[in-house]
Amino acid sequence: MITHAPIRYQSKFYFYENDYIIGASIKMYGEYTQVEVDLLKNYINSTSVVYDIGGNIGYHTVAFASMAKEVHSVEPNDRNYLLLEKNTQHLNNVKLYHCACSNVVGEAFISDYDTTQPGNYGECMMSETGQPCKTVRIDDMDLPPPDLIKIDVEGHELKVFQGAYNIISKHRPVIFYESMHGTGFDVIYDTLTTLGYTIYYFPAKNYNPNNFNGVEQNVFGGGGVINCIALPASHGKIAGLPEMCDRTDNYNIALGRFIKAKEKQ
C-alpha cells in the first residue's frame, strides 16, 4: 500500500507501508539517512548540478533539489520510479531517468519486490531475472557537468564508475557511494586516487537522534550502511572522517588508524 507522511522538505512524501527500512523511517522519523544529506549539503549550493544515481523513491533527490540548481535522478525499478515521480512532480529543477546506469548501453534486469509483503525495498539490484530495464552510460547521457554524484546501486558501483569515467575525469565532482567490498571496490579506489581524489569512510546509521519528528525511540538499533565520500584535490581534506589509504583498506582498519592518530594529538 502507498501512503504518505511529511518530511523536512515537503508536506507529503509517498512511500510503501510495508517497507520496513525506508518506509518505516519516513513514517516514524520524517526522514531517511538524513545524516548523509547533512554531510553532502556542504558541497551543494544554488548553482550546483547533482546526479542521484539510484534515486529509489526520492528522499535524497528531494533533499538535493531544495539546495541545488539541478538534480538528475536515475532509477530503474518500476515501483520505486512510480513514487520517485510522485514525490518530485512539483519540482521544476528535477529531471528523472527510468533506466539503470552501467558501463554498457543495452538491456538488463533489476530485482523486484512484492509490496503486499514486508521487506527492505531499498535493496533492488541488478539481477539475472526480475524487471527488464534499459542500461545507459552516464558519459552518453548528455548531462550538464556535475558538482556532486551520489551513487547507491547495491553492488553495481564499479560499472557505474566505468560508464562515467570521462565525466568524472574531466569535471572532478565530489562523489558519494556505498562501500561494498568484493564488488570492484579496490578498482574504484585505484581509479579515483589516480585522478587525485582522497576517499573517506562515512558511516550512516538509520536512526538519527536529531530526526525531523523529534522521536527518541530507536527502532533500528545500530543498523545502517558504510559509505565513501571521494573529494577531488580542489576540495581539500575532511578532518573528522577516517581516510581510505590503500585498495585493501576497510572501514574497521581505517577507523582504528583514525582513532590512534587522534590519541597521539
Segments the model singles out, each with a brief description of its role:
Residues 1-265:
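Phosphate/nucleotide-binding beta-alpha loop and adjacent structural elements of enzyme active sites
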